[in-house]
């Protein structure tokens, strides 16, 4: 049993806890504490009721500063200084750092100094962390000495397995990516000030270009592609699920069917449960609550001049990523 604490109980933190129970992994993980400055009543309410993912089907009760989920007691903390967190007293094996605010080595070291065994960040994190893991691609590189680990981003988890599969089958020279991402908490409900002038605009009324570090994230996991990928991103007026438009130049000449067959085959083996494939006429809402990191839409595959290939890949940017947090945390705990 892995003792975990969740630091930051926002979109990812709550989905991690939901995924833990909904997938039956509460026999693998024991959540000993949640740390968030939100009021306990708000924490319990937003765990029970979620606009994107519906009602949580497990019993939730609140008594003083203890959250009870399906009979399991979880301590609720509201401590803003990492150094003051009682991880040592609680016997925390791994902190799931889900604030999005603390993403560097110094923050991770503060968790370790407070008594945590290891830290898994729910963001790309700074380059000086011990490892960045995209589950299904490089989790076998984890060692017991690596205590500060990033789980990458939802978009890196979505696109890297597809690039990996295409490269294994045909060889990939280079590529470009457009991320079509659901709205996020850092956007405005109505026009309001933000340091990014595009994000001053109402999220529900526009398609909004935003900065992305996706290309750098790909290079961190697949260094052979350094300087060979570029990416842009837009946010669209939906609350969940992301589509990724991937275009790659291949080393081999291919047909649409050959590309789709390679991606169909990739859903087995190491990428089973990570990559999925569909040819149904689906739309974004159909992928809500899908636990895969990526779902290839074979109906949208295109080939130009036999070597330029375009694919469309879907993901639930919350639920898929939350499930990968649990996968990576387990491998971190088991690493020898």
Swiss-Prot record:
Residues reported in the UniProt entry to bind NAD(+):
11-12, 317
Tell me which Gene3D superfamilies the record gives: Dihydrodipicolinate Reductase, domain 2, NAD(P)-binding Rossmann-like Domain
What terms describe the molecular function in GO for this protein? erythrose-4-phosphate dehydrogenase activity; NAD binding
Q: Where in the cell is it found?
A: Cytoplasm
Name a single GO cellular component: cytoplasm
Q: In which pathway does it act?
A: Cofactor biosynthesis; pyridoxine 5'-phosphate biosynthesis; pyridoxine 5'-phosphate from D-erythrose 4-phosphate: step 1/5
Q: What GO terms in the biological process aspect are recorded for it? A: pyridoxal phosphate biosynthetic process; pyridoxine biosynthetic process
The catalysed reaction is: D-erythrose 4-phosphate + NAD(+) + H2O = 4-phospho-D-erythronate + NADH + 2 H(+)
What the protein does comes down to: Catalyzes the NAD-dependent conversion of D-erythrose 4-phosphate to 4-phosphoerythronate.
- Family classification: Belongs to the glyceraldehyde-3-phosphate dehydrogenase family. Epd subfamily.
Q: Kindly provide the name given to this protein in its UniProt entry.
A: D-erythrose-4-phosphate dehydrogenase
Species of origin reads Alteromonas mediterranea (strain DSM 17117 / CIP 110805 / LMG 28347 / Deep ecotype)
